[in-house]
Amino acid sequence: MDIMLSHFTALEAIRRQETRWILEKDRPARTHIMGNVPAEAPTDGEVAALLARSPLLAGLSRPLETLIPRGAGRRRSRLVKTHVCAQLIPAGSFLELAPGVRCVSPEHLVVQLAPLLSELELIVLLSELLGIYAVMPNVEGGMFQRRRPVTTRELIANHLDALGSFPGVAKVRRAMRHACVGSGSPRETKLSLRLGLNPARGGYGLDVLSMNAPLEVRRIHNMMKKGIRKPDILLRAPSGATRNGRALLGAAVEYDGKDHATEEAHQRDAARHNELTAIGVVEYLVTKAQYRDLAYMDGLVAQIRRDLGTPAKRKTRARARRHRELRQELYAELELIDGLNWNGLERARRRAENNDEAPGNDGWETVPVEAYGLD
């Protein structure tokens, strides 16, 4: 008996440390994997037998969400919940975790979950799958680091093309435009979104060049020795920008969530700061308290703009006030996205009821014209 994990069970399986080597190795190879959705739903007895012999499955939340084809009988019990796959899915839609146990691929998972998530939740999920971390509530820090992302923009885009008009495809395409690549933690993702999203979406509209990408530096204590620094977030400087008479590559923004840094950590921070400065990167550190302080973040971004030579667009008082409200709303909504509880659409529904808005609008489906940079 075969079983295909789907939806939130698949997400949980993809996040497990036991599956990381399957996901991180030969990512393009899985695009050629063919197969069919199991013909029928597993019985409780069959699921119980699988749980008994598979530590991976035994560690997943119940009921297990599984995929079945159209025409197969739906089932929902204490152990299993089925989802109908209404049409054929292309190669690359699943991977094998163990004999008889398959799971939808990261590329297909985001399409499955898209109708169930707000667009901001989908952006955060995509940023995790395109990043080098996995949310794991039962490990220290609530996450673990990956050696490399489990998917890429190209793999997702190719899968969307192969799916055609499959439900969820259009929403994933929209979210992909804003998703982070290379993020090292949920907080880095949220900080990058706040810095990079357009002001009409609650961001500061800065140009995020990269996240955790390697930069070659010279070690200050030994100028003959080369080294690598990987800024959490690197903001692009305009072509030809200079600072203090030197070429400016960009601005690095590092998130430091530690409440009390050690003297050794301070020394590492100082060494990194000096090495980045030497290659034309101005660096800023954002602490947990500063991240939560909207007035501080507004001032920090204003200083970054001055360093980069990219002044903010002039705004009317009304628009400036509205954009500040949106920045506060984005911060608050991101704080509610923990990677485990996906309630964004329900929150949007409640807001719509309170504001007499059209139901089903999470605030991202219809955006002001300035969101497209036309103002």
Residue ranges and their predicted role:
Residues 146-375:
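Surface segments flanking catalytic/ligand-binding clefts of nucleic-acid enzymes
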Residues 1-168, 312-375:
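Short gly/ser-rich loop at a beta-strand->alpha-helix junction or flexible surface loop bordering the NTP-binding
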